[in-house]
Amino acid sequence: MFKKSLVAVAVLGAVAFSAQAADVQLYGRIDTGVRYTNIDADVANQDDVSKFEMSSGNYTGNRFGLKATEDLGNGMKVGFVLENGFNSDDGALKTTNKLFDREANLFVTSDFGTLSAGRVGILNGTAGSYAIGNFNPFGTGWGDVGNQSLLWGAGFDSRYDNMLTYVTPDFSGFKVYAQYSFGENGHENKSSTNRYAALGATYTVGGLNVIGIVDTINKKSYDSTTKTTSDVDDTYRVTVGGSYDFGMVKPFVAVGYFKDGKIGDLLGTWAAEANHKANLDRYYDGYGLTLGASMPAFAGTAHAMVGYMDAEYASEANGTVTSGRQIDVTRFVLGAGYEYPLSKRTLVYADLGYFKDEVDAADAAKDKFD
């Protein structure tokens, strides 16, 4: 085992050295707009919370990056991607203490497929070199509007460190993808870190695109900060969907199932305003459905989606199960958007979203929350 580890390090080192001779491309995107949000907590004697603000990354995440590929001959190529995320409204890094937070990967491509190592986006998303989760017109972009993660995100991060990714060659439109993360730095592949794994496949022929992904979070069993054991169940998720481009319209349909997943951390600032936040911080089993479509309209493109989620209480945030506790969360999501290109590189857009959670909760004392 020790010799195999040394061989792997030597190969990656050679790839990094060779990639320095490649032509390096600088690229980026910037997205700034204004956003109005209204939150009704549905609590007696509590006013709605409204906010009008300048914001960045409403349509697509702001980024700049470096990437390069070098042809080594005999069908083999090496390359890298280094991509930073930032806020265009205040200039701050999107992620504290990470320069290339969106992606930092080194890859080798040959007739046997592509092997990548580093920080990359997960398969079940729409950001990164190997993301295949285009399950609705909005994907995981457009901020909270139409975001499919609201339906089956289940507490998965959009990216993980120390990730190995393998992609097979294209077999008549069919591809298989696999990912495994060793966990965060300093705790790689130890019981004190969460580890992500995924297996996915796509089939693309003509206008048809079919996607299937199974992924999981292998939860840590030891907390190195508190020096205590952890008994939180692993999270599992299965997502299947597809789309077909008819030219005049492109419909999307998808369904996702999750087990022992978190739903509260999907809402960002929305959860902080919700009167049922304590319920959303627990773990749930559930499913989500989405229907959507994109179509050309007035020299631009219009998008629309509708989504529904139903989840039932599985355990507390620490993994324990409270006897007699019954919580059911239903979620309804609507999204509409329009983008209009001013040139090959510049576009304007507008979107409108609606989101509603209903929580029916009862413990042994029959307490109710709406």
Please place each PLM-identified region on the residue numbering:
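Outer-membrane beta-barrel proteins
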Residues: 16, 52-56, 94, 152-154, ...
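Outer-membrane beta-barrel "beta-signal"
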Residues: 368-370
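Gram-negative bacterial Sec-dependent N-terminal signal peptides
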Residues: 1-23
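Outer membrane beta-barrel
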Residues: 22-36, 51-185, 193-209
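Gram-negative outer-membrane beta-barrel proteins
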Residues: 34-42, 86-92, 123-125, 184-188, ...
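Outer-membrane beta-barrel architecture
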Residues: 10, 65-67, 105-109, 165-167, ...
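Detector for outer-membrane/organellar transmembrane beta-barrel domains
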Residues: 198-335
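Repeated loop/turn-to-beta-strand initiation elements of outer-membrane beta-barrel proteins
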Residues: 76-78, 112-116, 173-176, 207-212, ...
